[in-house]
């Protein structure tokens, strides 16, 4: 174990990554649904993770800021990080947002449009308020169905109608997408481009650079921690190592 830790430390020192992490959260609450526990981070753990990021010099950015910088239309901080939330749970508004605001941090919420207003999920008013307070809203389809198994017509409905519904209800132009269950391929990525999306996030572990295909951005999944900040740091380290060794890398051609 000591030899492994020494090797990892040497790799990170010898080959510093040029990328940055995108964190993947779902629920931030003390009282999750019984079936949702693996996807829940208690508020105190979430706050500690945010404090760790700040102490390490990370600064939060939005997906749109990343897209603009990738096209030479802006600059990123020295250590950027994007904090994302999938599904659109109401605790993203009641629990996560205040903790982000206390630290001057931003986030991205990927919404399943047919869940909006249902018990435990964000309402339209909450979404619009989050947007006004610096949270970027992205799309997570209409029904949270894995896209690869759907017909072309169903894929188009899930990708396009959900985007239009968000924009019709007062959400600024939606540029970013999250694949339900990480279900994606080149054909779906092309559909997203044709539908005027600029970025899409997967469930693959890794860091991202301007060379990463923006339709296959990698993330660091953050489930309910069992070992506190140690586990959080190790998950970021794992993504870092995946990038160093070229695992799960989707590069532009």
Q: Which residues does each PLM region occupy?
A:
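Hydrophobic H-region at the start of alpha-helical membrane spans
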Residues: 1-3
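C-terminal active-site subregion of NodB/CE4 polysaccharide deacetylases
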Residues: 7-84, 90-91, 149-253
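Short, well-structured secondary-structure segments
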Residues: 21-24, 38, 42, 59-63, ...
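Alpha-helical scaffolding within the catalytic cores
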Residues: 67-69, 92-97, 115-133, 160-161, ...
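Short, glycine/acidic-enriched loop or turn micro-motifs at the edges of active sites
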Residues: 89-90, 143
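Acidic (Asp/Glu)-rich catalytic clusters
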Residues: 97-105, 122-139, 193, 211
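Short histidine/acidic/glycine/proline-rich micro-motifs that form metal-
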Residues: 113-117, 146, 180-183
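Substrate-binding clefts and substrate-entry loops adjacent to catalytic sites
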Residues: 138-153
